[in-house]
Amino acid sequence: SSVIFPFPRTGDVEKDSEPFRRYQLIRLAPDLGGESNDASSFRIYSMVCVHMWCLWDYIEGREVEVNGEKFTGNIECPCHGSNYDVRDGLSHKGPAIKQSKPNDALPTLPLEVDENGDIWVLPPDTALEADGVVGLGRYV
């Protein structure tokens, strides 16, 4: 499952709908450990494809193979066909895979899950070596 949300949220409907504020929280499939109720079950990625800044789609039930490993769930850009590994946001198919680092991985947001099961987004480190920059990428 997944949910799309703005970050940082401003309360202004127009600003909160800007593409560069759109992130998607993804609960990993069970074959990737997604049944756990801790932070390891979740990923948050910027929805802006690092290839040409289109907004990607999360295909929850899609079976994919990356480097010989098969799993469920894929991030796909409908504009030019870039695909990203749901586990780490690194491109594995399409034009984004041909881009030099750090322009081949989706920026992320850190998160934690508290004792009540609530998910909290933590302040990001926007360095390319950390959580990355929307539209540019990050090092993986």
Give short role names for the model-derived ranges.
Residues 52-53, 78-83:
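Detector for the c-type heme attachment site
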